[in-house]
């Protein structure tokens, strides 16, 4: 330990003696003090601007972030022990190193300082070397390095050693990432590739355990391959991610957030996504009642079909299952998916709305742009027949009963598909059917298909309100028109995205609570408001950009709903800023747990070693009986 402290002090002295340009870069100076090996950071260009934005957010939504006048400054004081001398207008950066290598003491705080004398006096800083201090007035070890107008704070001298003298993270970041950090928006950065490397063994172990638990469930083997295939797909997507960046902007009437995902070189998902052409079909105002969610996206038809076929082939041939499927079953399912996918055009829109009283919890509608309406009808018939055969091979019971609807909607013929499902433990068949009726109405899970010109409308559930309105909108000569709320959303999210999601947050939240079993009287009457939340996704070469806009009105109404249905949820943001129950007077710092318990036997090292802590002695061998 003494050797490590000496090396750290020497590095600090050398850096302080260097040219000013080396320690205080012109771009993002707080960020420039993080070492290259940082795997994540949170950068705030201005503390005062962030707290001003949070105060405006609290005034508009009622969701208070902290109780004090300066919640962020108070939070930093509790985490670092630095109570006085911090510049409330400066920039802040919090970096994170490898948790395994640094034994849970991996956090680096870079704070702006306006008065070094007040800072050191209030925290009882003792000089270790020029520019390096040990804080004696706080709970747990704290070390501070003076770097120009900034204080670098760590809870371990070994962590400080990794900071001082290391190559700056800014030199390793892409130029656009640095430019984003210099802007006036708080920014979060995560190197997903590094995190995957650090936790590779834990991730593999978790996946093996999770998939094993799936197969261990009674009567779950027929469905386990579906769930494991889904898990593999999510894991594959994450495995192709390289970095994630997020920036938050406070606007007068809402919050705007930008998210950027970069994929590793040669990622299959990037190759697929980069081929998509921009352009969005406007989400129609399909009903007078609020639509809880609407999703519309445009995909390149050839790439989309290729993706659907590759996913189907993987499910049929590579998904883990006790016995392989017969070739005849795989062939019919594959051909059905191919015919259906090739009949679709660029645009697909999904709508969800609360059902009318007595008609279940929700009603869903999908609107597909078609290349060939007749081929679409044939594809639906093939899908129904092929999935019946697949269900039989998986020891399920699934039959589709197709019948023409007795009453056409707006003069459009409707075909109804009634699936008959039976699976799992026989005693739960009735419970399963009751669950479907609760969700979708008296008919349970029912699909209705109507073709309107070059569009297909597919409805789920007994409530036909949204289904009828969508058909009427598509019959108009000028096509569907966006609702007023959607037109206002277009001011914040560009329409030339590949994927656009719009939500009425309180309606969507109320619908989700009802689906989860929350009593209707606790949910009460849901006010949809006049705005909608939007998520837009644009795919580029080896990257995806996500733009989000959350109006204050939607957040306020969602909070009012949560205060009735889940009052404990409204305290979650405030709990992050509550003072710790223990700590020194005025600082509120949570005492750090010791690396080793006081009574743990430790073998002293044979020689001074600045790189690794002393090993724990092995437990004595048991006596032979």
Go through the PLM ranges and name each one.
Residues 135-211, 440-526:
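A conserved glycine-rich beta-strand in the N-terminal activation segment of trypsin-fold
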Residues 40-42, 92, 107-109, 152, ...:
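One face of beta-strands
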Residues 370, 380-398, 420-422, 464-467, ...:
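Active/binding-pocket-proximal capping segment
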Residues 211-225, 461-583, 589-591, 596:
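Long, C-terminal catalytic modules of enzymes
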Residues 22-139, 177-247, 256-363, 374-404, ...:
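Structural boundary/hinge residues at secondary-structure and domain interfaces
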Residues 1-8:
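Bacterial N-terminal signal peptides that target proteins for export
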């Amino acid at each position: 330990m003494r050797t490590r402290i000496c090396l750290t002090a020497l590095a600090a002295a050398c850096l302080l003696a260097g040219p000013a340009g080396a320690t205080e870069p012109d771009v993002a100076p707080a960020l420039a003090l993080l070492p290259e090996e940082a795997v994540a950071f949170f950068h705030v260009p201005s503390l005062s601007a962030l707290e001003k934005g949070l105060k405006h957010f609290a005034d508009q939504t009622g969701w208070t972030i902290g109780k004090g006048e300066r919640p962020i400054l108070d939070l930093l004081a509790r985490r670092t022990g630095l109570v006085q001398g911090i510049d409330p207008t400066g920039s802040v950066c919090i970096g994170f190193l490898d948790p395994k290598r640094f034994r849970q003491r991996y956090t680096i705080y870079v704070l702006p300082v306006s008065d070094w004398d007040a800072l050191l006096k209030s925290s009882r800083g003792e000089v270790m070397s020029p520019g390096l201090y040990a804080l004696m007035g706080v709970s747990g070890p704290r070390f501070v390095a003076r770097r120009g107008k900034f204080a670098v704070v760590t809870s371990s001298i070994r962590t400080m050693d990794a900071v001082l003298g290391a190559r700056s993270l800014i030199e390793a970041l892409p130029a656009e990432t640095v430019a984003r950090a210099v802007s006036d928006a708080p920014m979060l950065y995560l190197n997903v590739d590094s995190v995957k490397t650090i936790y590779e063994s834990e991730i593999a172990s978790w996946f093996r355990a999770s998939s094993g638990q799936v197969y261990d469930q009674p009567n779950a083997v027929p469905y386990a391959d579906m769930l494991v295939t889904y898990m593999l797909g999510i894991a594959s997507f994450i495995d192709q991610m390289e970095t994630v960046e997020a920036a938050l902007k406070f606007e007068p009437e809402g919050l705007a957030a930008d998210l950027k995902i970069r994929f590793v070189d040669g990622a299959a998902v990037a190759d697929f996504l980069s081929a998509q052409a921009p352009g969005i079909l406007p989400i129609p105002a399909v009903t007078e009642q609020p639509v809880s969610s609407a999703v519309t996206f445009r995909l390149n038809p050839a790439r989309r079909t290729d993706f659907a076929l590759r996913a189907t082939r993987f499910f049929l041939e590579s998904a883990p299952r006790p016995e392989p499927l017969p070739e005849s079953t795989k062939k019919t399912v594959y051909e059905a998916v191919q015919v259906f996918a090739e009949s679709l055009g660029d645009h697909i829109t999904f709508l969800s709305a609360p059902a009318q009283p007595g008609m279940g919890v929700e009603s869903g509608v999908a609107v597909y742009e078609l290349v060939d309406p007749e081929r679409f009808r044939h594809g639906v018939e093939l899908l129904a027949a092929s999935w019946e055969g697949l269900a039989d091979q998986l020891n399920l019971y699934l039959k589709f009963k197709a019948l023409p609807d007795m009453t056409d909607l707006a003069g459009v013929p409707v075909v109804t598909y009634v699936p008959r499902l039976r699976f799992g433990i026989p005693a739960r068949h009735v419970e399963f059917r009751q669950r479907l009726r609760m969700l979708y109405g008296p008919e349970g899970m029912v699909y209705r298909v109507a073709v309107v010109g070059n569009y297909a409308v597919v409805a789920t559930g007994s409530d036909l309100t949204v289904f009828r309105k969508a058909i009427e909108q598509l019959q108009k000569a000028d096509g569907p028109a966006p609702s007023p709320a959607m037109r206002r959303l277009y001011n914040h999210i560009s329409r030339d995205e590949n994927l656009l999601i719009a939500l009425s947050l309180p309606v969507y939240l109320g619908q989700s609570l009802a689906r989860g079993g929350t009593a209707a009287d606790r949910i009460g009457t849901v006010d949809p408001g006049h705005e909608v939340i939007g998520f837009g996704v644009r795919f580029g070469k080896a990257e995806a950009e996500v733009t989000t806009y959350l109006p204050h009105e939607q957040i306020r109404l969602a909070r009012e709903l949560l205060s009735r249905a889940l009052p404990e949820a409204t305290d979650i943001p405030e709990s992050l800023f509550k003072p710790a129950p223990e700590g020194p007077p005025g600082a509120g710092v949570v005492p750090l747990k010791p690396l080793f318990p006081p009574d743990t036997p430790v073998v002293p090292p044979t020689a001074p070693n600045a790189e690794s802590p002393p090993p724990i002695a092995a437990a004595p061998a048991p006596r032979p009986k």
